[in-house]
Swiss-Prot record:
It comes from Thermomicrobium roseum (strain ATCC 27502 / DSM 5159 / P-2). Residues 335-465 are annotated as: Domain IV, binds dsDNA. Residues 80-118 are annotated as: Disordered. Plays an essential role in the initiation and regulation of chromosomal replication. ATP-DnaA binds to the origin of replication (oriC) to initiate formation of the DNA replication initiation complex once per cell cycle. Binds the DnaA box (a 9 base pair repeat at the origin) and separates the double-stranded (ds)DNA. Forms a right-handed helical filament on oriC DNA; dsDNA binds to the exterior of the filament while single-stranded (ss)DNA is stabiized in the filament's interior. Residues 72-117 are annotated as: Domain II. The gene is dnaA. GO terms for biological process: DNA replication initiation; regulation of DNA replication. Residues 1-72 are annotated as: Domain I, interacts with DnaA modulators. Belongs to the DnaA family. This is Chromosomal replication initiator protein DnaA.
Length: 465
């Protein structure tokens, strides 16, 4: 399997392991740029993103690639367009050394202006499939890229998950830079913006932060809905918005909903967002879905038979990301089994790999059952007051999986596990996350429980076929 296709399959697995917000912010725009023996190099859009990947997701990436390739893989991180790599993630890092690296990296984080724009080279206008569902957003994005700051300012693009909002933001940046290479263009997610602000406040470098974001020609901020309820972030973004707008600079914003439906958003921000052009993106129709599959197949270097294209397009109606995921599973199965892509193979690939359908079957009861089965403890022991390590570890893994797989709140998890306090749950989740970076046995246990959980969840689906 080629590196591009391997990474698409890996991303499909990683999307099941981490929260949607984390996947969208940190993993979605990465690439596997090199695979040499037992060494994989992952490229991120910026040094800050590479930093977050190394600190938060290295263990999951390493585990996924090792499983797919059938051999231990060491993961390295770099930045798009840079030859010098970030420090590798060792397969057996010492916990003390890991903590030291994280601390020093945090101190070295630069907030001064840099040439990094955070753009993904795959997301261009040429690769964006236009249909009735996105025609207005596409036309507005083109106009903004060609004449930034002159009209449609701000441009606010909204729509459901996986419909192409992020693609358009990156495409604006690429086209604007192609027209005027000296422009200062910046793409950033609202979560990265918030994290950089927190880091700047912590290290007393807010002036650097403001200089960075208020001297940009085109600022594109993704998933603005995540700043809702964050007063300090909203305050800083409000002043950044005003500074750029008054200087005639272009602002492009994306969200999963229109401004009026974003809860806990400051009225003054809502007013400014609504003062520009609001362009929505709807789910693609059948013809657009077919065109997307053909284009994505071309990018992967495969020609999709027309009956397979129609089958997948009719089967998946919700969003583009699920279309891409289905295509990746089909291509991966064909290459792994050395078979041509046929309708029968596509049916098999989607039946076995319909992660969304399996995920919908997950329940707290299934999680607790899988943990009990793997560790051979009873449910009464798991939710009871016992504090033996043989019980505490499975309980903490249950907390972690209830959080990661089902997205339950800390309070809900505590209620499921014998009425425990939310601080106890938070400690358990954090401890598992921390130890997953260095404890190979724990990673194996979590992987085994997760595999058992998904097998249990597949059972009701299998009975339907």
């Amino acid at each position: 399997m080629r590196t591009k296709q391997l990474w698409q399959v890996a991303l499909g697995d990683l999307a099941k392991r981490v929260s949607r917000a984390n996947f969208e912010t940190w993993l979605k725009h990465t690439e596997l740029v090199a695979l040499e023996g037992e060494r994989a190099t992952i490229a991120a859009p910026s040094s800050f993103a590479a930093e977050q990947l190394r600190n938060k997701f290295a263990a999951d990436i390493q585990e996924t690639l090792s499983l797919l390739l059938g051999r231990p893989i060491a993961v390295h991180f770099t930045v798009h367009g840079q030859d010098d790599e970030e420090h590798p993630v060792q397969r057996r890092p010492q916990r003390r050394a890991l903590a030291s690296e994280e601390g020093s990296a945090s101190k070295q984080l630069s907030l001064t202006p840099s040439p990094e724009h955070g753009l993904n080279p795959r997301y261009t206008f040429e690769k964006f499939v236009v249909g009735p569902n996105n025609r207005l957003a596409h036309a507005a994005a083109l106009a903004v890229a060609d004449r930034p700051g002159e009209k449609f300012n701000p441009l606010f693009i909204y729509g459901g998950v996986g419909l192409g909002k992020t693609h358009l933001l990156h495409a604006i940046g690429h086209r604007a830079l192609a027209n005027r290479p000296t422009l200062k263009v910046c793409y950033v997610s609202s979560e990265v913006f918030t994290n950089e602000l927190i880091n700047a406040i912590r290290h007393q470098r807010t002036d650097d932060f403001r200089n960075r974001y208020r001297t940009i020609d085109i600022l594109m901020i993704d998933d603005i809905q995540f700043i809702a309820g964050k007063e300090s972030t909203q305050e800083e973004f409000f002043h950044t918005f005003n500074a750029l707008y008054q200087s005639g600079k272009q602002i492009v914003i994306s969200s999963d909903r229109p401004p009026r439906l974003i809860p806990d958003l400051a009225d003054r921000l809502r007013s400014r967002f609504e003062g520009g052009l609001l362009a929505d993106i709807q789910p693609p129709d059948l013809e657009t879905r077919q065109a997307i599959l053909i284009e994505k197949g071309r990018e992967l270097g495969v020609q999709m038979p027309s009956d397979v294209v129609e089958f997948v397009a009719r089967r998946i109606e919700s969003n583009i990301r699920e279309l891409e995921g289905a295509l990746n599973r089909i291509v991966a199965l064909a290459q792994l089994t050395h078979q041509p892509i046929t309708l029968a193979l596509a049916v098999e690939a989607l039946r076995e790999g319909d992660a969304r359908a399996v995920r919908e079957q997950l329940t707290p009861e299934l999680v607790l059952h899988a943990v009990c089965q793997h560790f051979r403890v009873s449910l009464a022991e798991l939710v009871g007051p016992g504090r033996r390590r043989e019980i505490v570890l499975p309980r903490q893994i249950a907390m972690y999986l209830l959080r990661e797989e089902l997205g339950l709140s800390l309070v809900e998890i505590g209620q499921r596990l014998g009425g425990r306090d939310h601080t106890t749950v938070l400690h358990g989740v954090d401890k598992v996350e921390e130890q997953l970076r260095s404890d190979e046995q724990l990673r194996a246990d979590v992987l085994a429980v997760r595999a058992r959980l998904y097998e249990d969840a597949k059972a009701p689906l299998a009975s339907r076929h």
